């Protein structure tokens, strides 16, 4: 093990198998916090490879609590976080739009690591229980079409790195691979990433992990979401191939806004923003969700273009169907908790 750690310290790449070995040591609690911190920072400085990302993702999935759901039907749209944009909870809001389109959404998420409000924080503020049992998550996916999967709850072995990540206060490989480790076997995925240089290789990793179709995007301003502030870069994985594209908000009939226009706050403020979007209140928040939900619908294959996705997302919000998904989730959750 010391030899493998030294390779990383010496800026040498690890094979998938070598990374799996180190990750297993971490997830079984056999590496000290000091060594974990040194390892994570050395990886960050060196730069994470596709092999390393796949290796640690597979190790995480092996020790995860599995959530049963028919293979090949669900999707996720969570991002890496770590873009320091202090935006509102875009992917969480968009998830209700995707669910309203009839797509089962297994929304993987966590508390804030480098922002003021993570998806788990805003979900709690909305009244969503983030500590459901796996069988309850399955029930909600089946009955409502959306469930929140709290990362520390379904990845209990991550307890060995949570304190280290919080103390480091900077994105690490765990930000990059968190969205890759959903305990539901996904068919499609939209994944925002804060590093534009990793678009192509992350899409390749999703293919290695069994996705049939996926979009990995990096927004203007290097957001881990699609942005209205300029050009968005994304990689589409399909049929074993990856293709790179760009898209501006004007390309799909949306108005440009500066990044400051979608600034969020603490969980209470972000929950209010989420509700205002699902109510259809016009402005930068709504248009940002339309763009991101449009990408999600496109990643899923529900539509053939992002433009069609934006149009469908607008209809789903105007009709009240997206707002109803939030209400249904809370209603059926109470039914589960009352058992």
Swiss-Prot record:
GO terms for biological process: L-tryptophan biosynthetic process. 5-phospho-alpha-D-ribose 1-diphosphate binds at residues 79, 82-83, 87, 89-92, 107-115, 119. It holds the Pfam family Glycos_transf_3. Pathway: Amino-acid biosynthesis; L-tryptophan biosynthesis; L-tryptophan from chorismate: step 2/5. Anthranilate 1 binds at residues 79, 110. InterPro entries: Anthranilate_Pribosyl_Tfrase (IPR005940), Glycosyl_Trfase_fam3 (IPR000312), Glycosyl_Trfase_fam3_N_dom (IPR017459), Glycosyl_Trfase_fam3_N_dom_sf (IPR036320), Nuc_phospho_transferase (IPR035902). GO terms for molecular function: anthranilate phosphoribosyltransferase activity; magnesium ion binding. Its cofactor is Mg(2+). The keyword Metal-binding applies. Binds 2 magnesium ions per monomer. It is an enzyme of class 2 (transferase). Its EC number is 2.4.2.18. Keywords: Amino-acid biosynthesis, Aromatic amino acid biosynthesis, Glycosyltransferase, Magnesium, Metal-binding, Transferase, Tryptophan biosynthesis. Mg(2+) 2 binds at residues 224-225. Anthranilate 2 binds at residue 165. The keyword DNA repair does not apply. HAMAP family: TrpD. Homodimer. This is Anthranilate phosphoribosyltransferase.
């Amino acid at each position: 093990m010391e030899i493998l750690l030294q390779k990383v310290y010496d800026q040498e790449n690890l094979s998938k198998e070598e990374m799996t070995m180190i990750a297993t040591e971490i997830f079984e609690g056999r590496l000290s916090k000091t060594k974990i911190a040194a390892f994570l920072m050395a990886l960050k400085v060196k730069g994470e490879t596709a092999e390393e990302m796949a290796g640690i993702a597979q190790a995480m999935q092996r020790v995860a609590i599995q959530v049963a759901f028919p293979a090949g039907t669900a999707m996720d749209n969570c991002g890496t976080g770590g873009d320091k944009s202090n935006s509102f909870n875009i992917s969480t809001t968009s998830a209700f739009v995707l669910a309203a389109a009839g797509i089962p959404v297994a929304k993987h998420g966590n508390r804030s690591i480098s922002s003021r409000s993570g998806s788990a924080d805003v979900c709690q503020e909305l009244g969503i229980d983030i500590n459901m049992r796996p069988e309850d998550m399955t029930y909600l996916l089946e009955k409502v079409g959306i469930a929140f999967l709290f990362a520390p709850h379904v990845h209990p072995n991550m307890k060995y790195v949570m304190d280290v990540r919080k103390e480091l206060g900077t994105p690490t490989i765990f930000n990059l691979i968190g969205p890759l480790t959903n305990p539901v076997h996904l068919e499609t995925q939209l994944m925002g990433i804060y590093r534009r240089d990793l678009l192509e290789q992350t899409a390749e990793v999703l293919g290695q992990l069994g996705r049939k179709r996926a979009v990995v995007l990096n927004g203007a301003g290097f957001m881990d979401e699609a942005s209205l502030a300029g050009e968005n870069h994304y990689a589409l994985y399909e049929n074993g191939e990856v293709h790179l594209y760009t898209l501006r908000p004007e390309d799909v009939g949306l108005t440009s806004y500066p990044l400051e226009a979608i600034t969020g706050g603490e969980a209470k403020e972000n929950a209010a923003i989420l509700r205002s979007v699902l109510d259809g209140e016009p402005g930068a928040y709504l248009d940002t969700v339309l763009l991101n939900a449009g990408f999600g619908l496109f990643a899923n294959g529900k539509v053939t273009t992002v433009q069609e996705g934006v149009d469908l997302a607008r209809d789903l919000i105007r009709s009240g169907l997206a707002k109803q998904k939030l209400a249904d989730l809370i209603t059926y959750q109470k039914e589960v908790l009352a058992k």
